[in-house]
A protein has these predicted regions:
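Non-catalytic interaction/Regulatory regions outside core domains
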Residues: 1-124
Length: 124
């Protein structure tokens, strides 16, 4: 098993733990090309976008994280970024140097509290 496959296995477990949280709808690890390599939707959750739109959203999330890293030298690294929408809260966490943990949560969540919980569960 490669080191990368080992990381994916670890993140599969972490995503499953995150999905046990009531407020989390989706937890997935995206590779640098925006491919979902582990995780997914909580059982019983209906995706709000079709597969093509989700793939586009995944690629855009990775690109946004990468773009923010251009400012790490001056401002320090981004721990997470979040956007509150009417239907969901989306959160991204840079992990494994060039991967992204993408979280979709219920729209009523306290973003900072949820982010701290995610970082605690994932230990980063």
């Amino acid at each position: 098993m490669s080191e990368q496959e080992s990381h994916y296995g670890i993140f599969t477990k972490k995503c499953n733990l995150l999905l046990e949280e009531n407020e989390i709808r989706f937890a997935g690890l995206l590779d640098p090309m925006g491919n979902l390599v582990s995780g997914g939707f909580k059982k019983g959750i209906e995706p709000l976008k079709d597969e093509v739109e989700r793939k586009k959203m995944f690629m855009e999330a990775v690109l946004r994280v990468k773009t923010r890293q251009d400012f790490d030298d001056n401002l320090g690294p981004v721990r997470y970024a979040a956007s509150r929408r009417d239907a969901v809260v989306m959160m991204t966490f840079p992990v494994l140097h060039d991967h992204v943990l993408l979280i979709s949560a219920e729209p009523h969540v306290d973003i900072d509290k949820t982010a701290k919980k995610i970082m605690s569960i994932c230990k980063f």
